[in-house]
Amino acid sequence: MKSAEIREAFLRFFEEQGHTRVASSSLIPNNDPTLLFTNAGMNQFKDCFLGAEKRAYTRAVSSQKCVRAGGKHNDLENVGYTARHHTFFEMLGNFSFGDYFKRDAITFAWTFLTSEQWLNLPKEKLWVTVYATDDEAYDIWTKEVGVPAERMVRIGDNKGAPYASDNFWTMGDTGPCGPCTEIFYDHGPDIWGGPPGSPEEDGDRYIEIWNNVFMQFNRTADGVLHPLPAPSVDTGMGLERVSAVLQHVHSNYEIDLFQNLLAAAAKAIGCSNDGQASLKVVADHIRSCGFLIADGVLPSNEGRGYVLRRIIRRACRHGNKLGAKGSFFYQIVAALAAEMGEAFPELKSQQAHIERVLKAEEEQFAKTLEQGLRILEQDLAQLKGDVVPGDVVFKLYDTYGFPMDLTADIARERELTIDEAGFEREMDAQRERARSASAFGMDYNSLVKVDSATEFLGYDTTEGQGKIIALYKDGQSVDQLGEGEQGVVVLDRTPFYAESGGQVGDSGFLQAGAARFDVRDTTKTGGAFLHHGVVASGALLIGSPVEAKVDADVQHATSLNHSATHLLHEALRQVLGEHVQQKGSLVDSQRLRFDFSHFEAVKPEQIKQLEDIVNREIRKNTPVETELTDIETAKAKGAMALFGEKYGDTVRVLSMGGDFSVELCGGIHAKRTGDISLFKIISEGGVASGVRRIEAVTGAAALAYLNAAEEQVKEAAQLVKGNRDNLIDKLSAVLERNRQLEKQLEQLQAKAASAAGDDLSNAAVEVKGAKVLAARLDGQDGKALLALVDQLKNKLGHAVILLGSEHEGKVVLVAGVTKDLSSQLKAGDLMKQAAAAVGGKGGGRPDMAQGGGVDVAALDQALALAVPFAEQGL
């Protein structure tokens, strides 16, 4: 059976047993912040098992895409070198949420594996393990299913603690847990290895193909197991492993799915397909990379993006080992989509996007790969012992973008290991430097502790009445704030919006009788709104009633920019692709800043598309609508939630242009899209690997920006004696004339240098039979000095030459040594001395070198070094 047929058979079998077929969840877990990637079929059902979520079904079946690379489950360095380690795999699973339990779970598994209608595996090839004290499961297997006792193995606490066993599953130190039973396939005596539980169990003869976890207990902090009222079942069977069994091969890389990917990888690289470990690495890694990018991950230097970058770069390096020329990895995506796109349509729909991301990352890595490998080879050549020092590993990571496991991979090929602890120490030191650099002053949001929550009035008004419930000065609670004192005021009710979701906090003032407090910013800690500012007059007392008034003009301008970010977000997804995710924003009254995930610079024509889409929505002048609902209803309506953001039971859904933009947002917004008036992007650039930033203006600020640009056009036209209509032609003519003049200048300088060369050759002094010439030629650039040194070397025939110039406020130096002397005297050595004398650096070949510096006053002193340099070397 082919892998795709096995997958479909599994899903269909359990559907016939009353299970609901559930699609694979994303590789980015949406309900578990402790997980880097989805790594098991049960991840998406975690809340069902915990009783926190009720679904319309109590039986489920799925084929879940999983990634195990980085974090706790990191087998990256083994991938390609063993038969069964992968960064990506499919987990087939059936699940019961308080429905059936051990008897049905065991019967289902056995029927599917051994029945002629399904997989028809020989029963005598199957071994079974149970937890040592799980007599119930043991009896079901032996007395009801009929597995003979000689193929049954009880596994006890083999990990050094109670319930720490290969056959006892726990979610943590406390919580749901229970025994499990595993089914193993015996590949036969030709393969080394022993049955589970034996000293030889790590061999490849007996391979686990199915695991049934029985969530039977709740473990409390005292270690006691309490029976769960509704026990559940979580099972998993690796598709790749069972495919190897059914296709009668002993390595996962020999199954049909991998054979096609290996062939595609060999073709893209231009190498043979002979089972090389490096080719297996590439074939494995295209799966994890393709699926991760399809699920919205982009290469970066942190978190999930960094794991993706590590996998891509490892694949590139192994392709390079096999002789790949240029970018190759992205070319295998088509084969991946053809092989797995039927079961996972996102591979086909996002094929072009995946290819673009991989190609861009390959090209970026290629720039440093060769140089980094050369540095590593130099370090390894000087290595004493068999451990690569941590500082070397860190240098390669920090300077050349080599992930630690890539260096470990290269070291492994030379039977070396790396000093991981030393690398981590270097990383910790770097993090500490970063923390020190980012230290800043007092943070009221962490210092202020307020039990009461503030009622927010600002969605409906910019003015309101409230009462002072807390005052703070220098982070300390006080009873009053006097005139001229800076501090924080907390009210029971306020119309001031507190900084959140990228929107800056409101400003304005609080009036308490004769006392006035100028609010410069508003933030939030817990449920309390903190009004930061200074007492302009009088004194504020706890308990005093106040009139709160927001600066409505500033808030209105800010709200327009905030609404524009929502329109921009959707426009970005339409123009660049659905992989775009918000990575940060800053919205104030002057402009908006929007950070988003993308792998390359946004092209000028794409900028125009973005502006056209946003301005089209503005011109439609549709209402900006809000609705309070629960999170699941909001998501069902297509509302975008920011990844990593925490949402309560009730969320605020903001819709613009009907269903054009639907997001969860608690900010202040325009009433209608037409209020924004105009949208103009003023800059685009990168802020981090895989993260781009757009800055834009709206309304009056956008009009002012365009007016200023118009004035600049007019001024430019006047400078070239033209007008707006012929400005481009005029500028082109000026630039062409400038190019011609520069060419003429170069020719004149060359003639002058040639004439100077004739004169200079006469100024050379003789040192031990060689001519030594040092001269100052102010105004000449490096190019002219190089040409002159070449000319002088020909004239003098047997010489050391050092020329210097003051050019545009800096020192330019060129040194030359004729070939016959370059084995004794090296121009690069002379240049290092001369450049150092003028506060700079330099270097080059033995016969020619360049340098420079900033200390013009020391130029003559630097030139004087030529004669003693020659005297010492000859």
Curated annotation (Swiss-Prot):
InterPro entries in the record: aa-tRNA-synth_II/BPL/LPL, Ala-tRNA-lgiase_IIc, Ala-tRNA-ligase_IIc_anticod-bd, Ala-tRNA-synth_IIc_core, Ala-tRNA-synth_IIc_N, Ala-tRNA_ligase, Ala_tRNA_ligase_euk/bac, DHHA1_dom
Keyword Acetylation assigned: no
Name the predominant localization: cytoplasm
The Swiss-Prot or TrEMBL record lists the needed cofactor(s) as: Zn(2+)
For molecular function, the Gene Ontology terms on record are:
alanine-tRNA ligase activity; aminoacyl-tRNA deacylase activity; ATP binding; tRNA binding; zinc ion binding
Recorded GO CC terms: cytosol
- List ligand-binding residues for Zn(2+): 562, 566, 665, 669
Q: Does the keyword RNA-binding apply?
A: yes
Q: Name one GO biological process term.
A: alanyl-tRNA aminoacylation
Q: Which E.C. number(s) belong to this protein?
A: 6.1.1.7
- How are cofactors bound according to the entry's free-text note? Binds 1 zinc ion per subunit.
Q: What is the uppermost EC class here? A: ligase
The record lists its disulfide bonds as none
Query: Any idea where this protein resides?
Result: Cytoplasm
Key words, A-Z? Aminoacyl-tRNA synthetase, ATP-binding, Cytoplasm, Ligase, Metal-binding, Nucleotide-binding, Protein biosynthesis, RNA-binding, tRNA-binding, Zinc
Q: Which reaction does it catalyse?
A: tRNA(Ala) + L-alanine + ATP = L-alanyl-tRNA(Ala) + AMP + diphosphate
Q: Which domain of life is it from?
A: Bacteria
Q: What is known of its domains?
A: Consists of three domains; the N-terminal catalytic domain, the editing domain and the C-terminal C-Ala domain. The editing domain removes incorrectly charged amino acids, while the C-Ala domain, along with tRNA(Ala), serves as a bridge to cooperatively bring together the editing and aminoacylation centers thus stimulating deacylation of misacylated tRNAs.
| Family assignment from sequence similarity | Belongs to the class-II aminoacyl-tRNA synthetase family.
Purpose of the protein: Catalyzes the attachment of alanine to tRNA(Ala) in a two-step reaction: alanine is first activated by ATP to form Ala-AMP and then transferred to the acceptor end of tRNA(Ala). Also edits incorrectly charged Ser-tRNA(Ala) and Gly-tRNA(Ala) via its editing domain.
* Name of the protein described by the UniProt record: Alanine--tRNA ligase
